[in-house]
Each structure stands twice: as structure tokens, then as C-alpha cells.
A protein has these predicted regions:
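A conserved, positively charged/aromatic
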Residues: 113-144, 150, 157
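A short, well-ordered alpha-helix in the C-terminal region of glycosyltransferases
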Residues: 183-186, 322, 329, 336-351, ...
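Short hydrophobic beta-strand element within catalytic cores of glycosyltransferases
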Residues: 293-296, 306
Length: 381
């Protein structure tokens, strides 16, 4: 008789383009056969949700929006869990972290796991209080970096034994270009001989694009530098106006959300991550895996990845002068770019590959399943 597979439900509000969503995509692609992954989109599937569906993994879209104004929507999540009867619920991002875990606890799902990917000091007090209550019945929260774990323990007053660091991972195959640098630049309208920096991030306050634009405008030595801005978000129009106001519109290229990241990285000479707060930005890790030197802010998990002066340059968050100085340093020193880029690739490939991440998650699942074997119940077909 074939052993029953362990059903794992991955819950998120929506699977848009982002690091946490990429983690779920990596898991459903690489989990060993003893696990049966299912994905539940509380609100909408999003582009990553559609990619997950193409792997053959069941993807449910509930169309719900739980919160203080719609607390009854938790009931919809409960019904889904009641129908699917998973042994493990693993939540990602804030809405699922609170309402998904609440539904899983109320439905007595045997193993409940959360994920914390950001240091977010401005989290609302009610969310912090909810996290503290939910931790009493949460079996583990996976933190994306040591600094994220340390902050979460202070913020939520969690039991340290229940918060485990598992560094996020990157599918470095995404960094392989299908086109040449010259061809990509031609398609983007970037001169073949230009110096090109890039940022891949959602267009939100967190990611600090405005400070990068200010830095570009501040230094005459950066007049040849073009910037590829990859990603979408609510600040798109504001940032376009800011670039225009600083007379950068001919050098700042807004590309929107893209999946051809290998081609775009091949067109860059350096990568910039000017975030004000973070967890562990996977686009930065991917860029390092592509052999690019990085300029990044020294927040959260970034200094755990970028070694200042060896694999990139670290600057304080929101410091335009420091950011302009770092950009100028790399823009005017091609050997340093080459040296740091090679060191960056060598540093991240062994530490942040998908195989290592999936192995760590599987060990966590196995440990919790063995520890709480008395809770287990058969999955519903």
C-alpha cells in the first residue's frame, strides 16, 4: 500500500510578483513526492498564482478580503480548510499570517506555520496583538534572516524556540540571459556604451526609489548612468513625475513588472537596492548570482548577504549623499565592479539556492510532524 501523502496548504492574500510568492513557487516545484502541495489565494491568484497553477498544483481563489470590516471572511478560509483537511498550513504575508492562521487554528489543522519576511516597525498595534495571540497555537514562524527573527521576537514577544531562521532562496536559473547585453539594451532604448544600474522592486515607499533618483540627480559624474526600474506599484505615477522633475526622464526607464530577469540583469553593470526597511530582498540575491556588484542600504538582512567593500557597498537608508557617493565610486571604477561582481556570485550561489531552502523547509515539516504526531488526521481526497 502506498503511504498517504502529507497535504500542505500554502496561504497568501494574493500571489503577486514578490519574494515571498517566489518562495511558494519554489516549494511547489521542488517538494519531495511525500508532500501534496495545495495553494489558497485568499483574494486573487496574481501572476505567480497562475505560474503555480501551471505546475499542476491545485490553486483555489476565494475572492475574500478579511479584515476588521469583513471579519466574516475568515469563515470562507475555514470552509476551504474544512474541505481540504490539510496536515500543514503554511502562511505567507500579513493577511494570511493573521487571518489564515486564525482560520487554521479554529479548524484544528495539526501543524500551523507562519512566515516573517520583513522588519516592519510600523506594523499596526492590532496586528502585533493578533500575532502575539496567534503565536500561542502557532507551531513555528519561519524568519527570512537573523535580523528579522530578532526583531520579530522583540515585537511579538514570541517563544524563541518557535521562530526559526531559514534564509530565502533564489532559482539562479532565472539569472541566465536568453539575449545578449547589446540586444537587450537596444530593445530598451539604452545606448550600447552607457553605464547601466538597475533596481528590481515594487514601487512602494519601502523600496526607497525616490532617494535613488535624488542621488542620480545630485552627482554630475553620474550623467552617463542609465537606470532600469523593474516592478510595478502604487507609486508608479509619483516616481515618473519625480524623475521628470529631476530631468532624469531620458535616463530612467520604467519597465513595469517583468519575468525576463536574466535578460534585464545582463543589461546592467550594477544593481541598487535602496530600501528603507527590508527582510531579505531576493531580487538583490539574484543580481549577485548574476555577477553584479550591489549598492544597498544596511537594513535588516541585507548586511547578512552583502559584505561591504567585497561583494558590494552598503549605505545608510535614506542617505542621498552616501548613495550618490557609492554610485559614483562604482561608476568610475570598472575593475572594482568586476571584482565585487565575481565575489558576489561566489558568495550567494552556495548559500541561497533553492535546493538548500527546500531541504530546510522539509526538515522543519518532518520535525513538527514527528513532534505532534498525535494531532494528525487523514487528508480528505
Amino acid at each position: 500500500m502506498t503511504a498517504a501523502r502529507t497535504r500542505v496548504v500554502y496561504l497568501a492574500h494574493a500571489f503577486m510578483v514578490g519574494g515571498a510568492e517566489e518562495m511558494v513557487l519554489n516549494l511547489v516545484r521542488h517538494l519531495p513526492p511525500k508532500f501534496e502541495p495545495m495553494v489558497c489565494c485568499i483574494n486573487q491568484a496574481g501572476p505567480i498564482g497562475e505560474e503555480i497553477r501551471h505546475t499542476g498544483t491545485p490553486v483555489a481563489v476565494l475572492g475574500l478580503n478579511p479584515g476588521l470590516r469583513r471579519p466574516w471572511d475568515v469563515g470562507g478560509i475555514r470552509r476551504y480548510l474544512r474541505d481540504t483537511r490539510p496536515q500543514i498550513v503554511h502562511t505567507f504575508l500579513l493577511t494570511a499570517s493573521i487571518y489564515g492562521r486564525l482560520a487554521a487554528i479554529l479548524e484544528r489543522v495539526p501543524i500551523v506555520i507562519g512566515t516573517e519576511v520583513n522588519i516592519y516597525e510600523r506594523k499596526r498595534r492590532r496586528h502585533v496583538l493578533a500575532e502575539r495571540l496567534l503565536m500561542k497555537r502557532t507551531d513555528c514562524v519561519v524568519a527570512s534572516a537573523r535580523s528579522v527573527r530578532d526583531f520579530y521576537l522583540r515585537q511579538v514577544h514570541a517563544d524563541p524556540s518557535k521562530v526559526e531562521v531559514i534564509y530565502n532562496a533564489v532559482d539562479f536559473a532565472q539569472a541566465q540571459p536568453a539575449k545578449s547585453k547589446i540586444d537587450v539594451r537596444r530593445e530598451l532604448g539604452v545606448p550600447a556604451d552607457a553605464l547601466v544600474a538597475g533596481v528590481i522592486a515594487r514601487l512602494t515607499e519601502q523600496k526607497g526609489h525616490r532617494f535613488l533618483f535624488d542621488a542620480l540627480a545630485a552627482s554630475p559624474q553620474l550623467s552617463r548612468l542609465h537606470l532600469l526600474v523593474v516592478g510595478g506599484g502604487e507609486l508608479h505615477d509619483t516616481l515618473v513625475r519625480q524623475a521628470d522633475a529631476r530631468r532624469l526622464s531620458g535616463r530612467v526607464h520604467f519597465l513595469g513588472p517583468r519575468r525576463d530577469l536574466g535578460d534585464l540583469l545582463a543589461a546592467m553593470d550594477m544593481f541598487v537596492m535602496p530600501s528603507l526597511w527590508e527582510g531579505l530582498p531576493l531580487s538583490m540575491v539574484l543580481a549577485m548570482g548574476a555577477g553584479l556588484p550591489v549598492i544597498a542600504t544596511a537594513v535588516a538582512g541585507i548586511p547578512e548577504v552583502v559584505e561591504d567593500g567585497r561583494t558590494g557597498l552598503l549605505v545608510p537608508p535614506g542617505d542621498v549623499a552616501a548613495l550618490a557617493s557609492a554610485l559614483t565610486r562604482l561608476a568610475t571604477d570598472a575593475p572594482a565592479r568586476e571584482r565585487m561582481g565575481s565575489a558576489a556570485r561566489a558568495a550567494v550561489i552556495p548559500r541561497f539556492n533553492v535546493e538548500r531552502y527546500v531541504e530546510s523547509i522539509v526538515r522543519l515539516y518532518d520535525r513538527l510532524l514527528n513532534k505532534h504526531a498525535e494531532r494528525l488526521r487523514p487528508a480528505r481526497a
